[in-house]
UniProtKB/Swiss-Prot annotation:
The keyword RNA-binding does not apply. Catalyzes the epimerization of trans-4-hydroxy-L-proline (t4LHyp) to cis-4-hydroxy-D-proline (c4DHyp). Is likely involved in a degradation pathway that converts t4LHyp to alpha-ketoglutarate. Displays no proline racemase activity. The gene is prdF. The active site is at C89, C237. This is 4-hydroxyproline 2-epimerase 1. GO terms for molecular function: 4-hydroxyproline epimerase activity. Belongs to the proline racemase family. Its EC number is 5.1.1.8. Signal peptide: none annotated. Substrate binds at G90, H91, H209, D233, G238, T239.
Length: 311
């Protein structure tokens, strides 16, 4: 029996989002975190079928569209990639909101989107750009020292922006699109160093995103973000920008309401600001997504790679 999975693809600043509209098994009616756990425990093969080759690629971020728990939410969503599941995804939320408009589900205005780490507020503007009011972001630790084999001592901040990040400003690497291989090798070594040293986020949270910053002549900063699974973010990374704002706010380098223009390694830009909150900040990230495909993924029973090429 052939299985069919309906998808709509978009990209946000070059970073793709694959919205799964239908075709996944029922995950029950619990919270997005509970449904994510069911998906991971019982139906993870659907994630790999959508994201891994031959139907996907390491760059893709998947977003499973779910019925929300709260009646005042526009949608629920579970984010995943080639290595597992994400608590929140900024660029993905922008892509989801833009796609919901394409589907005729929402119009311009403010919409609530349920995620596994909480409900985020997203505004679809008249020009179809999207502002995402993220979950609470905060810096967990400042100036953490780490020895990275092959590179020497490294210092960075640990911050939460919806995922855990290790943020490095003084790294000696050239943050540019033609230097991605070297940036990936460096960031991967840092992540391995963190794991080896037992350095984590709060409550033992795995630091699975590494963010490198550099000056940019046209914007406030340019960044390279290594995501779980060794793919780099083509967008400026919404959760990473949120983590960056948390550090800037903690250091008194960015005032509430001031706009921070964050460029990605390929030059796409998010505009970000924050309001102060108890225990950290609440950031808002604005960017644009563009639609790229509508498709039906076919899964044949006799296909040896029907659930993806799993390494």
């Amino acid at each position: 029996m052939m299985k069919r999975i309906q998808i709509i693809d978009s990209h946000t600043g070059g970073e793709p989002t694959r919205l799964v509209v239908s075709g996944f098994p029922s995950l029950g009616s619990g919270t997005m975190a509970e449904r994510r756990d069911v998906l991971a425990r019982e139906y993870d093969r659907y994630r790999t079928a959508c994201i891994l080759e031959p139907r996907g690629s390491d760059v893709l971020v998947g977003a499973l569209l779910c019925e929300p728990v709260s009646p005042d939410a526009a949608a629920g969503v579970i984010f995943f990639n080639n290595s597992g599941y994400l608590g929140m995804c900024g660029h993905g939320t922008i892509g989801v909101v833009r796609t919901l408009h394409h589907m005729g589900r929402i119009g311009p205005g403010v919409h609530r989107i349920e995620t596994p780490v909480g409900t985020v507020e997203a505004t679809l503007h008249d020009d179809l750009s999207v502002s995402v009011r993220n979950v609470l972001a905060y810096r967990h630790a400042k100036d953490v020292a780490l020895d990275v084999p092959g590179y020497g001592p490294v210092r960075g901040d640990i911050a939460w922006g919806g995922n855990w990040f290790f943020l490095i400003s003084d790294h000696g690497q050239r943050v540019a699109g033609d230097n991605v291989a070297a940036l990936t090798a460096y960031a991967s070594a840092v992540r391995e160093g963190l794991e080896r040293a037992g350095i984590t986020g709060a409550n033992g949270g795995e630091i699975d995103h590494i963010e490198l910053f550099a000056d940019d002549p046209e914007h406030d900063s340019r960044s390279f973000v290594l995501c779980p699974g060794l793919a780099y973010d083509r967008s400026p990374c919404g959760t990473g920008t949120s983590a960056k704002l948390a550090c800037l706010a903690a250091d008194g380098k960015l005032a509430p309401g001031a706009v921070w223009r964050q460029a990605s390694v390929i030059g796409s830009v998010f505009h970000a600001s924050y309001v102060q909150a108890e225990g950290g900040i609440v950031p808002t990230i604005r960017g644009s997504a563009h639609l790229s495909a509508e498709a039906t993924l076919l899964i044949e029973d006799d296909d040896p790679f029907r659930w993806g090429i799993v390494s």
